[in-house]
Regions:
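Acidic, PIN/NYN-like endoribonuclease modules and their adjacent C-terminal/linker elements
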Residues: 1, 102, 106-131
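Short, well-structured N-terminal submotif of metal-dependent ribonuclease cores
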Residues: 1-34, 45-60
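Generic structural signal for small/hydrophobic residues in well-ordered secondary structure
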Residues: 6-7, 41, 80, 105
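A generic structural signal for short hydrophobic patches within well-formed alpha-helices
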Residues: 10, 38-41, 119
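Short, hinge-like loop/turn segments at secondary-structure boundaries
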Residues: 47-52, 87-88, 129-131
Length: 131
């Protein structure tokens, strides 16, 4: 399965949460990390007390697991517009960064792994919501 990792899932993985680590090991044939997630993580690192440690851990995660980073390009931007319009039309709201994450997921045809239940309103992607 192509797994696209949300910010909260990376945080769980880095903390060694067994459910998350096991799910990724069992189902993650290919692991993708949207650039938007990397931005959210770096924001947390910068405002935290262990910036260098956390940045090194993220780099190791990307390098050791051969994680593919999904960049925001014109194709992702078009998918963002499609998803956002669909959400507006049905009166659903999710954080803007999460629309970008969903668009990134749609771009690679992956399944989003997250703890955020609001992704269930995004019809264009498959989502696994960890409890």
């Amino acid at each position: 399965m192509k797994l696209v990792i949300d910010t909260n899932v990376y945080t769980d993985y880095a903390a060694g949460v067994p459910e998350t680590v096991d799910f990724m090991a069992t189902h993650g044939e290919t692991i993708f990390l949207p650039a938007v997630v990397i931005g959210e993580l770096h924001f947390g690192f910068v405002k935290g007390k262990r910036q260098t440690f956390n940045e090194k851990k993220l780099k190791q995660f990307i390098d050791l697991l051969s994680v593919d980073v999904i960049l925001v390009d014109a194709d992702v931007a078009r998918k963002y517009a499609t998803i956002y319009l669909s959400l507006v039309n049905k009166g659903a709201k999710i954080p803007i960064n999460d629309v970008w994450i969903a668009a990134s997921c749609m771009e690679v045809g992956g399944t989003l792994l997250t703890r955020d239940k609001h992704f269930a309103v995004v019809d264009q992607i498959e989502t696994v919501i960890l409890e």
